[in-house]
Every structure is written in structure tokens, then in C-alpha cells.
Curated annotation (Swiss-Prot):
Secreted among keywords: yes
The organism of origin for this protein: Chlorocebus aethiops
GO cellular component: extracellular region; MHC class I protein complex
Full protein name: Beta-2-microglobulin
InterPro entries with a match to the protein in the record: B2Microglobulin (IPR015707), Ig-like_dom (IPR007110), Ig-like_dom_sf (IPR036179), Ig-like_fold (IPR013783), Ig/MHC_CS (IPR003006), Ig_C1-set (IPR003597), MHC/Immunoglobulin (IPR050160)
GO aspect biological process, one term: immune response
Gene transcribed to yield this protein: B2M
Keyword annotations from UniProtKB, A to Z: Disulfide bond, Immunity, Immunoglobulin domain, MHC I, Secreted, Signal
Keyword flag Endoplasmic reticulum: no
Gene3D superfamilies: Immunoglobulins (2.60.40.10)
Annotated disulfide bonds: 45-100
Main location (coarse class): secreted
Signal peptide annotation: 1-20
Record localization: Secreted
């Protein structure tokens, strides 16, 4: 009995220690297919390597939040950091700018990463 209680206490201490680890998110913005002006595509924002799990992600068109944005389920890696994919359909052209804005406890404020159509 004592052994199982001790193991439970150790497990709780270990799990509570995981909460103290904070990792800033890595942000990648890319299109599903090579961009062609006037042709429908998908804009993706892959956010990875962050901890804790609470995070805000917005896809932007000319600085404004885009509608109909979907996302994957929150998942975690072997190192217990989290990752997500946000995506939406869009039609690129020469005049519009697209970006992904992320806010997380590890950041001093929201971080915006622009989509580079040449990547």
C-alpha cells in the first residue's frame, strides 16, 4: 500500500513539474500548393514546440482575421511539447498580404509571421 501511494505522489510531482516548463512556439506559414494568382489554395500555419498548451492563433489577410479557419486537434510530441495546424482556403493575388498571428504565455506579445509566396 505504501509503495503505491509513494508512486502516486511521485507521478503527481513529475506531472506538476511538466507544467513549469515553458517553451515558445515555432511558427511556419506556407501554402499547400505552389501559389498561382487567382487559383484557390490553402494557407497553413503550423505552430509547434510550445508549452503550456494554451495558445491563440489567427490567420490574417491584410492584417484582418480571416473567416472559416479550421484547425487540427491539439497534439503533443515525445518531449511533451504541443503542436497545431491552422488552415483556411484562400485565393492568392499580388496585392493581398497573408500572415499568421500567435499569442502565447512565453511571448512578450503577439508574434506575426508573414506568408512568403516564394518559400
Amino acid at each position: 500500500m505504501f509503495r503505491s501511494v509513494a508512486l502516486a505522489v511521485l507521478a503527481l510531482l513529475f506531472l506538476s513539474g511538466l507544467e513549469a516548463i515553458q517553451r515558445a512556439p515555432k511558427i511556419q506559414v506556407y501554402s499547400r500548393h505552389p501559389p498561382e494568382n487567382g487559383k484557390s489554395n490553402f494557407l497553413n500555419c503550423y505552430v509547434s514546440g510550445f508549452h503550456p498548451s494554451d495558445i491563440e492563433v489567427d490567420l490574417l489577410k491584410n492584417g484582418e482575421k480571416m473567416g472559416k479557419v479550421e484547425h487540427s486537434d491539439l497534439s503533443f510530441s515525445k518531449d511533451w511539447s504541443f503542436y497545431l495546424l491552422y488552415y483556411t482556403e484562400f485565393t492568392p493575388n499580388e496585392k493581398d498580404e497573408y500572415a499568421c498571428r500567435v499569442n502565447h504565455v512565453t511571448l512578450s506579445g503577439p508574434r506575426t509571421v508573414k506568408w512568403d509566396r516564394d518559400m
